[in-house]
Amino acid sequence: MPNSRPRPRRGAGGGAGAAGRDRLVARSLQSAEHCLGDQDFGTAYAHYLLVLSLAPELKDDVKETFQYTLFKWAEELHALSRIQDLLGCYEQALELFPDDEVICNSMGEHLFRMGFRDEAAGYFHKAVKLNPDFNDAKENFYRVANWLVERWHFIMLNDTRRNMVYNAAIQKAVCLGSRTVLDIGTGTGILSMFAKKAGAQSVYACELSKTMYELACDVVAANKMENGIKLLHMKSLDIEIPKHIPERLSLVVTETVDAGVFGEGIVESLIHAWEHLLLQPKTKEENGNCGKYGKVIPAGAVIFGMAVECAEIRRHHRVGAKDIAGIHLPTNVKFQSPAYTSVDTEETVEPYTTEKMSGIPGGYLPLTECFQIMKVDFNNLQELKSLATKKPHSLNVPAIKEGVLDAIMVWFVLQLDDEYSLSTSPSEETCWEQAVYPVQALEDYCIQPGDRVTMEASCHDCYLRIQGISILHLEHEMEVMKGFTKSKDLLSLGNEAELCSALANLQTSRPEALEQTCMLEPTEIALLNNIPYHEGFKTAMRKVLSSLAPELLWQPMDTHCQYMEMNSGSGQSDAAPSTADPFYVLDVSEGFSLLPILAGTLGHVKPYSSVEKDQHCIALDLIAEANHFPKETLEFWLRHIEDEAAVLQRPKSDKLWSIIILDVIEPSGLIQQELMEKAAISRCLLQSGGKIFPQYVLMFGMLVESQTLVEESAVQGTEHTLGLNIAPFINQFQVPIRVCLDLSSLPCVPLSQPVELLRLDLMTPYLNTSNKEVKVRVCRSGRVTAVPFWFHLCLDDEVRLDTSGEASHWKQAAVVLDNPIQVQAGEELVLSVEHHKSNVSIAVKP
């Protein structure tokens, strides 16, 4: 805390008034310091406000102490949920210090924490403008920029063909008389500007995102169209005539379609537009000026599908192994990903995931021909209204190849009018991804030519839903459903004895054997399928536990058998009597983790899991029971602590941990926030000889040339946007690091061998350096556009987990250069690597 007391300066006017003011200022300063000493931050803050209102000339003297007081008081207000008071304090502070980047950044952090991302971005952006070298503000701005301006904006604006086709369709409509235009979900305003350039008389554009609305205002003004385009910061559903728009319009243009067509609400917005904003549609019999009628671009969409085999989708949506590093997964625990929805579900979550299938690691195998799922006419109000209420229709598609049914892949042709169209097929060079409906909950996923894939398609809750996916197999001249559940199979049993026998086999007569569905994120399912990860942890944990009790070294025998032996009878082995203290193992990795159960198989261990969700706890208990754990061996750590924010603490007041497992890399490929701080606390909680896993982390990187990364990170000039000046404005939201990459399938040319860039040591922090320069030899001539990076998690010196490996559940990341560097084979470049508060930056020096 700053501890300097400024001396009040006498006002130039002198006299009794000035003297009284000085005395009040001095007393208030003294009171503020006393309150700070007593940690009464609210009262101290009030005293500083009084001082600065009476003596603004003291701003520079008390600035640091005032900041400290403000931040401490704001944390207390946040803990008390006094949000209005908190925001009021920051507004007062910014009136006093309007150009203080530290206060701006702190205000942004509070707003972001409260969910006001648009507003937070404004404060982070202002802080960076005030001080471009302020790392905390830069990192905060990069983080929020990914939320506010999603990366697909850059990809779509760089898609020249998409821009040309939309421009041509809009030009044609305007030339045919559609002179009053509304652009729904305008984004940067590009479609509105196409309409204005085509000669539209009145153009309106609406955008809900505050950030994108303000960006569109800047873009439209820069292109000198601010007088011809009226921008509205609102949803199209809230637009009223004549309040916002004077009269009904002849044309609506929109691109509010996602990979599954309907996911961005296009059906709802077009129903509202036809009912409240557009002129009546032109009938087939009517001719004449199009300006008298209403019309929508795009005019409609045709949706296609294909059944595919794809190992990458499979490993993210189905748990393939029945045994993971010696842990048996019982059949009564069913894992599912959020993309799974049953036929009778009423959930409104997005029922699909999205992938760029042309670049998915390992590729995919078509199992059926392409088939049409549905067709929709955006210029037909009755058809739009019936979409959400129409009953699901069945599809029955013959298989043409042998394989494993992993997903239904969906794409569409967007028919802008009767002449112009865009396809999102994986065989097209397009900015769109495909919608993927993973197949789950079948008894058998194998398919042969002649089998048939059946499913139901609907537009329930304005999402395209593909449900009830099954395989019909032609066998003995009968179609037998392979996807029958066990309960349906029971109905075919011939007599009561068989029924009883089947029930016994299914263990449905025992209440504790009831099935538990466990919903996991795709990365969590991929983690369960990552066998080297679990085997690596098992090996490393065994080494540590053996070193802590050498007299308990295991005999060379099967681990599972030994574990069964040591836990039979009294539940303890001869080598580990019940009076001995167990080894305490804490797993604080995020999400669902089997590591505590793995630890429990290694001897006299008390493992603690930090899973939060009830269904995850139940699933782990069932797995522990199936693996013959003594009751209450596995504990759930969050049930034992009062403050969930303080997860890292002793197992008991007089005990320490033998192993603490930390989550060090996010699934996106970045270092976890506050990693080194967590490691510092963890080191204080370890017994002598105890370890943090991983013990250290190595970061690797390489030089590459990748036009894909360039175009996904920033808009490239005006050529792609057909002469419109958009790039400088949206590129303010570009971030230097691209996350969630698959280096194995990224279109790129390696220009160097991988090199070690950084070491983060969690056990011996004095080995760490925050800055490092690394020389990299160029092995191939080209343009360096990016530096992809990944990590090796070193559980010890022998056991390493590679986040770029084939089985990895982690993605990778890359630093994308602002300006590519031309290099020749044999040259050396220097990479300047900086690690600051769990954020890594890489600069390339020629």
Curated annotation (Swiss-Prot):
Keyword rRNA-binding: no
Compartments where found: Cytoplasm
An example Gene Ontology molecular-function term: protein-arginine omega-N symmetric methyltransferase activity
Domain of life the protein comes from: Eukaryota
Repeat (TPR) residue spans along the chain: 25-58, 67-100, 101-134
Keywords, alphabetical: Cytoplasm, Methyltransferase, Repeat, S-adenosyl-L-methionine, TPR repeat, Transferase
GO BP annotation list: methylation; mRNA processing
Pfam families noted in UniProt: PrmA, PRMT_C
Keyword check for S-adenosyl-L-methionine: yes
InterPro entries given in the database record: Arg_MeTrfase, PRMT_dom, SAM-dependent_MTases_sf, TPR-like_helical_dom_sf, TPR_rpt
Gene3D superfamilies the UniProt entry points to: Hnrnp arginine n-methyltransferase1, Tetratricopeptide repeat domain, Vaccinia Virus protein VP39
Main location: cytoplasm
Residue span(s) of domain SAM-dependent MTase PRMT-type: 137-466, 530-846
GO CC annotation: cytoplasm
EC assignment: 2.1.1.320
Similarity comment: family membership: Belongs to the class I-like SAM-binding methyltransferase superfamily. Protein arginine N-methyltransferase family.
Subunit and partners: Found in a complex with PRMT9, SF3B2 and SF3B4. Interacts with SF3B2.
Protein function: Arginine methyltransferase that can both catalyze the formation of omega-N monomethylarginine (MMA) and symmetrical dimethylarginine (sDMA). Specifically mediates the symmetrical dimethylation of SF3B2. Involved in the regulation of alternative splicing of pre-mRNA.
Protein name: Protein arginine N-methyltransferase 9
Organism: Mus musculus (Mouse)
Gene that specifies this protein: Prmt9
